[in-house]
């Protein structure tokens, strides 16, 4: 039975407007049902003494929900918070403390750090120091099974949080916020990080906590900055969300990457000491480089524009290498079963798969001899992409989505397998989950890579790999080291979770006569003709 999610509210600077906040919470709960907790970041109290607070402190008024707040961010409100360990301020209102971890009975783990950054000695009561951040990091990250935390609460924003993300509006994230909090976020990997103080609402695109293809997939982080309560501009100050504690989640579900996930904005900050040193701003780089964090030794930089940046005397793309012997897939080879060919372009051709999973299972193949996508010249890649897009439109018109995979292992000529899956069979997420689940069962590390990534930035020519591309553009990649199951892609697609034809997992069990193959090829050519871009030339 699935774990029931917790329903939480997070709030920005209250600044003494307790009635406004709690009346709003009552309205929300009346409309949407009760929430489990309210988490307040930023300035909970206003600078002046407020009779409104006395009503709550004496019990004349009561918060309608269990509320947890951070400590002071200035001297004026420090007197409301006695001690570093936290305490009850009023019924249903609890001060968490200077720093620490709050773990609820559900297993939800909330890390909190009160105050603003300070390098002064002694550290003011309303501030935190590099030592505070270091002790928090050590306390949590020293555990051998540490994967991250559910929620991080801080009052200041982390510095550079806007890098690689959507616009943060009027807040310049390169010049505001705390570098110490940035480094803490790198270490703690919170699933949600809430902050305030800037009187602005900013929900950043989620960012990843791992380097693609260099580290195992990890959960993404969502950073949300909230405005001040009752602000005249009506900026969002209250954020509702549901969450299942990560300790209760299946790994595949936890590490599932949102479609709009970005690079980690603080990726240089993890290298900083736990001091108040400046974290250098991430350099402007091409998308492919920051997705994979490649050094010059590991991969080539792609130009950041679409223009050809080769020098005037640069070498022209080399011709494809000649096969060492007879090749079943070079179109000029006498070994090719030409009756299976259904379309021929300038650099590539389409052929029905021999022993296909379905009658319209096709292959995209280069006419010349290339072993893998990584080795293709630019003009061949362009036509491969054209075929992929055309096949997607073709299959969509027939009520199907297509899955594409390549296995560059124990093969001599590139074969891009394109398998249509009826829309009625399953959703794209089901296909993705099936690949991930079956990969885990076979100890295959299948990693998600960015949608617009270039395989050439991931694998070097000659490297063995397997990759899957879904109709949404999502891609899964495995770097093959040894003993990869040759039929893995077919086995997943033939499984009960997708096409439900497990008996067809091995192509050799699906072969038909040449007459039948010729009939299928004729039918495909006829059906595909309205989509055939080669006729436009």
Swiss-Prot record:
Name the record gives this protein: CWF19-like protein 1
Pfam families: CwfJ_C_1, CwfJ_C_2
CDD domains in the cross-refs: MPP_CWF19_N
Encoding gene per record: Cwf19l1
Residue ranges of the TM segments: none
Lineage: Eukaryota, Metazoa, Chordata, Craniata, Vertebrata
Superkingdom, taxonomy of origin: Eukaryota
InterPro entries, alphabetized: Cwf19-like, Cwf19-like_C_dom-1, Cwf19-like_C_dom-2, HIT-like_sf
Family (UniProt): Belongs to the CWF19 family.
Region of interest (Disordered), residue spans: 297-323
